[in-house]
């Protein structure tokens, strides 16, 4: 049986509260947390205790006879996509903290905490959420539907700490974007894809280097890893710059997707 349910999902990592409500589509709205109704205290009942500046308001339609609805279906069908759109939109620690039924909604399933991130001010998203985000989101949905693995792997990778783990994730993202299924010459397709997106020679060389480092990891070539890491290139800052470059590649793909 078809059923509609309203949920709210707080967003962490915004430097500013949205000045006005932003409609992403007919069923999704981003708005400020309602302080008059003490919405922040309501969210705390579901373990969502962060200092949030905005929430997603979602009118979710689902089949109540399906055991995977509304959870985890809501995440698989919608929340993960919006979460990915936020982390690709700009540099910073940002995302959807969890989901709770909207106040006064009749729902017995409770809520879900998906992230307990508490970014410092300087770590927060370097862009405002406004009408520009709404325009970007429309394009993002098209790109996400074409390359869901690339965006979901990047989204999950943002919560990881090991440079080796994030390096493997980054190369998985690039392969998902640029390499045809079953193709073995992966690096050449990746570098050619970056050329098509008009990245600079230096940026393409950086991706070449991270692919080489990933190859040393997955082939358990410890000698090669140590040789690379003892040089002057593979510093903490270098890895951080590479991971930011991966985000920019995804952002540019949103502007210019191809199948």
Specify the residue positions occupied by each region the protein language model found.
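Glycine- and acidic
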Residues: 154-158, 195-197, 227-232
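Charged, non-catalytic interaction/linker regions at domain boundaries
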Residues: 1-165, 243-244, 249-253, 257
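Residue-level recognition of hydrophobic positions within alpha-helical transmembrane segments
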Residues: 79, 165, 171, 210-211
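A glycine-rich, aromatic-flanked flexible loop/lid motif
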Residues: 143-144, 183-187, 214-215, 222
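Charge-enriched, short contiguous segments at helix-coil
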Residues: 107-117, 128, 167, 201-209, ...
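Flexible secondary-structure boundary motifs
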Residues: 166-204
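Short amphipathic alpha-helical segments that mediate assembly, nucleic-acid/protein binding
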Residues: 72, 133, 187-191, 203, ...
